[in-house]
């Protein structure tokens, strides 16, 4: 297994010809979001393990029957990936596959692990839907992170949300250049943000973080309307991904106008 240089990421684009076209993977390949890619062969990769920093997890893409790759993957995880993750404060290995065949393969190669699995749901934008974001009075104010009239760094709890965003983007400059972000303010505190988590040439994903004390007040909905309106104006597709158990996220996606389009498995096991 070899770690690719960022300038060579494009070489694995063809490995996504089958299965789910994860923006979380494509954004790494296109060097829009921070991550890492490990392959079986630098010159002619057939199978890849893609690390996404924002998701704090991996994706298998390419040939799921690559015997040499499959033979060595557990050894590679035990000796390299375990250290790679622990340096980031992560004590588990999380992975998804791009195809149903990969899901079967994951079950086989990690059969000796205490493998946990759950379903993830993918929502895409219903093109027949119209956005109704008419101005309304709120107890809070909503600003774009690009609004230079407001110093977002001046809010008392900005550092927390800065950590959330930099996990996905590396630094705020990248987000301002390539992404979208709106935040809600109550007094001198930020109480929620909605942002494009991953960006590809034609798609943006949405992420939301709302202060626990301010949930179930419609803040996420109004922030998301601002973000998705901007993204649609750019002519890009929208992508929403959440756990099957996350009913509030599903309800919000549907309220915004998304429709469920795909499902897939995500897997996890602890590392020692």
Where do the model's predicted regions map?
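Catalytic phosphate/metal-binding cores of nucleic-acid and nucleotide-processing enzymes, i.e., regions
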Residues: 264-268
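Short amphipathic alpha-helix that is part of the acyltransferase structural core
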Residues: 1-22, 128-171
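Conserved beta-hairpin
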Residues: 34-51, 179-192
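Acyl-donor-binding surface of acyltransferase catalytic domains
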Residues: 41, 45, 50-151
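Conserved active-site alpha-helix within GNAT-family acetyltransferase domains
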Residues: 100-114, 221, 244-262
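Conserved acetyl-CoA-binding loop-helix of GNAT-fold acetyltransferases
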Residues: 67-81, 216-229, 251, 255
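Conserved hydrophobic beta-strand within the GNAT/NAT acetyltransferase core sheet
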Residues: 208, 238-242
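A conserved beta-strand-loop-helix scaffold within acyl/acetyltransferase catalytic domains
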Residues: 169-212
């Amino acid at each position: 297994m070899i770690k690719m240089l960022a300038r060579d990421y494009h070489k694995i684009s063809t490995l996504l010809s089958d299965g789910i076209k994860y923006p979380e993977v494509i954004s790494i390949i296109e060097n829009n979001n921070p991550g890492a890619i490990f392959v079986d062969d630098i010159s002619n990769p057939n199978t890849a393990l893609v690390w996404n920093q924002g998701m704090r997890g991996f994706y298998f893409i390419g040939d799921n029957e690559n015997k040499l790759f499959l033979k060595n993957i557990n050894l590679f995880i035990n000796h390299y990936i375990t250290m790679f993750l622990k340096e980031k404060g992560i004590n588990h290995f999380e992975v998804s596959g791009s195809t149903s065949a990969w899901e079967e393969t994951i079950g086989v190669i990690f059969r000796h692990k205490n493998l946990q699995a759950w379903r993830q749901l993918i929502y895409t934008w219903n093109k027949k839907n119209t956005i109704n974001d008419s101005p309304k009075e709120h107890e809070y104010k909503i600003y774009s992170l690009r609004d230079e009239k407001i110093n977002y760094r001046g809010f008392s709890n900005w550092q927390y949300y800065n950590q959330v965003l930099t996990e996905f983007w590396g630094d705020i400059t990248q987000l301002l250049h390539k992404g979208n972000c709106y935040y809600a303010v109550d007094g001198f505190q930020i109480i929620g943000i909605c942002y494009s988590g991953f960006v590809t040439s034609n798609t943006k994903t949405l992420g939301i973080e709302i202060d626990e004390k301010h949930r179930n007040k419609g803040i996420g909905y109004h922030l998301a309307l601002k973000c998705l309106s901007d993204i649609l104006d750019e002519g890009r597709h929208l992508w929403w991904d959440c756990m099957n158990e996350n009913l509030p996220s599903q309800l919000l996606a549907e309220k915004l106008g998304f429709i469920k389009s795909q499902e897939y498995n995500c897997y996890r096991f602890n590392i020692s």
